[in-house]
A protein has these predicted regions:
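Sec-dependent N-terminal signal peptides
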Residues: 1-2
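C-terminal motif of bacterial Sec signal peptides marking the signal peptidase cleavage site
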Residues: 5-8
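Feature captures C-terminal
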Residues: 12-32, 80-91, 95-200
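Start-of-domain marker
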Residues: 18-52
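Electropositive phosphate-/nucleotide-binding environments in soluble metabolic enzymes
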Residues: 37-40, 44, 76, 80-84, ...
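Short amphipathic
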Residues: 59-65, 134-136
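Second-shell loop/turn segments in exported
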Residues: 66-76, 130-133
Length: 200
């Protein structure tokens, strides 16, 4: 049987005699474990076998963090960590790390808490099914990329050092500690979302 999934609802508070809407009010309702503190018992019974399997995976501890890692511009521990992971993951494609790792701040949806790191916490930080993409770019294109990052007041990066003014102007940049050469080819490890031209 078919059904509906409501992703957005509004309540018509005011109508005319002909039922024409003249006023609408709305508010955000976060659908999470706090909102659903008292789930339907029958539904919970049906879902339990699947929930148990998912929980077993999500609660698996895969590492530890000695500190809270937050996200934010111009850079942060978490954004730099994720960019560094992408840079190192390029070994699978290149046989060596990429010259640069890049992730957008908007793609990071949570912080990494101090203590044990679970699979579920990684999914909360990176909830989208993004794939690793390794791009090869000329130095001239890299400079345009760096200017774009500067105009956003920073993104998650690794393998490079940038100096950005408070106004979002690129002041200086190096790749692997070296100046950017216009005709040289560089590799950038990022996510498919950005590689496809999305993001700000």
């Amino acid at each position: 049987a078919g059904g509906f999934l409501f992703t957005s609802c509004r309540s018509a508070r005011e109508t005319t005699a002909n039922y024409e809407v003249v006023g609408v009010k709305g508010s955000m309702i976060t659908i999470d474990s706090v909102w659903d503190a008292n789930p339907d018992k029958r539904a919970a019974e049906i879902l339990k076998p699947y929930k148990d399997k998912v929980d077993a995976m999500m609660y698996e501890v895969i590492g530890t963090s000695e500190m809270i890692m937050d996200k934010g511009n111009p850079e942060s521990l978490l954004s730099n960590l994720v960019a560094g992971v992408l840079q190192q993951a390029a070994v699978r494609v290149l046989g060596k790390p990429a010259d640069m790792g890049l992730v957008n701040m908007g793609g990071l949806r949570n912080i990494l808490p101090k203590g044990d790191i679970t699979v579920g916490e990684i999914f909360e930080i990176l909830p989208f099914e993004n794939s690793l993409c390794v791009l090869t770019m000329k130095g001239t294109d890299m400079k345009r990329l760096f200017k774009a990052i500067a105009s956003l007041h920073g993104e998650g990066v690794s393998g490079i050092r940038m100096e950005i003014s408070k106004e979002g102007e690129l002041l200086n940049v190096t790749i692997g500690g070296q100046p950017v050469k216009d005709d040289q080819s560089y590799t950038v490890a990022t996510i498919d979302y950005l590689a496809d031209g999305n993001g700000r």
